[in-house]
Amino acid sequence: MTVAETLAVLKSEKDIEPSADYAGEENTDDFILAIQTDKTKQTKESAWIVCADHVKEHSGSLNASTTDEAFIRTGTVTTKTGTQRTLAVNGNRCVGDAFQDFVLSHKIKYGTGKDVIVPYVYFSVRTGKGEIGSASLVVTGDVGGAANAPATFAVDVKAVGTPKDFNYLTDVTA
């Protein structure tokens, strides 16, 4: 499902749409993670593929890099040198889901370097605010699970560089 299709479903079924005036709680279901799987056909973010079907989690973390230096009469000072966004995605395998089929393709599972870097967007469906950038897709599990249990998958979406500020309300036209 695309970003535009997902937002249309949320509007019609739950009366949820991005609003600059939204104030209140957000839950995990209020965030969209989408990637561009075909740069020739998906030229706008609204056409990118959403990570959702049979996905149990897409947890974001910010991993800071630091250096420690000791100075005379000051002591140790920690300097933040960078931050990398990581989105940990996992769920039950669903063949035919465009997101899963792409991230679990042979090209991505065994790819390296620029072959596994894709544009991504991560934003709130309540406010439209989030981030956009490029990320490496690192598949950490393609078929997990115990006997008689659903097959599972896991992938880390690791930002390359610093993502840009994103606002669906002002940056995207369907």
Describe the role of every protein-language-model region.
Residues I132-A174:
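Mixed-charge, glycine-accented linear interaction segment located at domain edges/termini
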Residues T2-N90, S136-P150:
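Solvent-exposed edge beta-strands and adjacent loop segments
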Residues A70-S134, K164-A174:
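Extracellular/virion structural assembly segments
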Residues H54, R93, A159-G161:
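Secondary-structure transition/turn motif
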